[in-house]
Amino acid sequence: MTKKAIISVYNKDGILEFAKELKNLGYEIISTGGTMKYLKENRIDVINISDVTNFPEILDGRVKTLHPNIHAGILAIKDNEEHVKTLNDLNISTIDMVVVNLYPFKETIFRENVAFEDVIENIDIGGPTMLRAAAKNFKYITVIIDPADYGLVLKEIKENGDVSFETRFYLATKVFEYTAYYDSMIFNYFKYIRGDKSFPDYLTVPLETVQKLRYGENPHQQASFYKITLPFIEKSNIANAEQLHGKDLSYNNILDSDSAIELLKEFDEPTCVAIKHNNPCGVASGDNIFEAYKKVYNSDPVSIFGGIVAFNRKVDRQTAEELKKIFLEIVIAPDFDEDALSLLSTKKDLRILKLLTLDKTDVYYDVKSVNGGMLVQEKDRKLLNEDYQVVTERRPTEKEIEDLIFAWKVVKHVKSNAIVIAKDKMTLGIGMGQTNRIWAVEHAISRSRFDLNGAVLASDAFFPFSDSVEAAGKAGITAIIQPGGSIRDKESIDAANKYNIAMIFTGIRHFRH
């Protein structure tokens, strides 16, 4: 019996050669619409699918393949006598191969100012239906969604007379992989257009491979990097960054770069951020990025070694000359002067990343994996309220308020328990990841290379006891910003008054785990 293949593709890469080879191997080709026209124009004999269904394409092509004569031929179990008898009674032929790829939904939703009607018309219905039917019946049918698999299928047919069970299973798996991804894009796009910010009962995220990584967090762990393919998430992310120079990014590089970019988004004035092991080891703002970088370097010249440095302004030659003096894994910026890029590129292993933007628009969920599930929450975008409360006898000066706001922006991005000490919009000491707050305070104080008189302190959560304020006062710190909310707040306020410290309660906590 002559084998039959249905070919209906939007992406026509390689399809002419594949169809010609199938014809040479004795297959009949059934096709639809644009694909049929394309094959015929290139002198490939095909059967119009309407001749199989005995029904015309209708509704501007919305209904072409949705017919029992097609789907019975795809779904029939070929060694089931009842199925075979039914097909014979109804004069329906079995289908041996389905070659389909889908309307460009992803490309459509990424078009600027795309009309919603165009989005709707690019939701493929008949294609996924045929693909899923064929993938379900993979024991008997070969299904191809990816043009990259044409060669594999032809090779097996030529060598073995048919496609192996293992390959059919592999190809069917690819179909369900892609159709799930395709449907996830549709679901998320519809949810966004409706303005629905609720947490759904069933959450799917459309993820596409950016790169296969050499390894994960450690060399014995395999890893890959995926990006969310939705048009409404922030463009300012590590997945969209353009690599201008250097080795491929590692798993840890990507984590640290993400932390650097997210912290940079807090600042409008020229700012430099240094990240090590997913924590800031130095942050500073200045009149220009050269000044900001020098402040960051001077705040902790040890930890910055082998770290990541990121800027929210174009990198100039003067700054590049300073960066070149030390070993860094990555330099990130919105742009680089030509001579700055040339200079940094002399370090062959240095990864140089250019950000598309540093916008703060709608964001997708913040997602963390746990064994057996995922935790999903809103991004922590809470800003400092202007109605923060001064709870001490002394009010902070204007300069202290500027430094307090600076430190508050930084502490939000430090692992809890987190303390940031700052002065002149420059971090002096950062205490991170401690299991109690006084240790975080002591850690931040001990790490400072500078006199802390006149410095300010930010805490990501309230002080459970007054000991942290006592330690800050003894170190010369003159202002504190913290959420407040402890049952012992009065003890901390009394300690602040004792040392003439101005203290602000924000009412906002910024835990980070």
Curated annotation (Swiss-Prot):
SMART domains: AICARFT_IMPCHas, MGS. GO terms for molecular function: IMP cyclohydrolase activity; phosphoribosylaminoimidazolecarboxamide formyltransferase activity. Keywords: Hydrolase, Multifunctional enzyme, Purine biosynthesis, Transferase. Gene3D superfamilies: 3.40.140.20, Methylglyoxal synthase-like domain. Pathway: Purine metabolism; IMP biosynthesis via de novo pathway; 5-formamido-1-(5-phospho-D-ribosyl)imidazole-4-carboxamide from 5-amino-1-(5-phospho-D-ribosyl)imidazole-4-carboxamide (10-formyl THF route): step 1/1; Purine metabolism; IMP biosynthesis via de novo pathway; IMP from 5-formamido-1-(5-phospho-D-ribosyl)imidazole-4-carboxamide: step 1/1. It catalyses: (6R)-10-formyltetrahydrofolate + 5-amino-1-(5-phospho-beta-D-ribosyl)imidazole-4-carboxamide = 5-formamido-1-(5-phospho-D-ribosyl)imidazole-4-carboxamide + (6S)-5,6,7,8-tetrahydrofolate; IMP + H2O = 5-formamido-1-(5-phospho-D-ribosyl)imidazole-4-carboxamide. Its EC number is 2.1.2.3, 3.5.4.10. One of its GO terms (cellular component) is cytosol. Residues 1-145 form the MGS-like domain. GO terms for biological process: 'de novo' IMP biosynthetic process. The IMP cyclohydrolase activity resides in the N-terminal region. HAMAP family: PurH. Belongs to the PurH family. PANTHER family: BIFUNCTIONAL PURINE BIOSYNTHESIS PROTEIN ATIC (PTHR11692:SF0), BIFUNCTIONAL PURINE BIOSYNTHESIS PROTEIN PURH (PTHR11692). This is Bifunctional purine biosynthesis protein PurH. It comes from Caldicellulosiruptor saccharolyticus (strain ATCC 43494 / DSM 8903 / Tp8T 6331). The gene is purH.
